[in-house]
């Protein structure tokens, strides 16, 4: 796993997650647990849980990056 660890994500910061070739950009709205967060997609403004993005597994390209 490259990039940031789930435990280092912070509320109000913007991130890019890459998994199985899909790219998602989101902002963390609140912490739900030690490794789960409520997030808002920056492109569609949809709200969902971060775990929903990798609930089917983490690919070889799994990476979380902070964006500005």
What are these regions (language model features)?
Residues 45-68:
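Intrinsically disordered, low-complexity, charged/polar segments
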Residues 1-11:
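Mixed-charge, Lys/Arg-rich low-complexity intrinsically disordered regions
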Residues 8, 28-30, 55, 65:
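Short, exposed beta-strand/loop patches in secreted or surface proteins that constitute
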């Amino acid at each position: 796993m490259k990039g940031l660890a789930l435990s280092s994500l912070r509320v109000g910061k913007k991130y890019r997650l890459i998994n199985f070739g899909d790219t998602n950009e989101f902002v963390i709205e609140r912490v739900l647990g030690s490794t789960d967060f409520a997030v808002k997609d920056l492109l569609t403004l949809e709200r969902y849980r971060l775990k929903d993005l990798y609930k089917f597994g983490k690919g070889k390209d799994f990476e979380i990056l902070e964006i500005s």
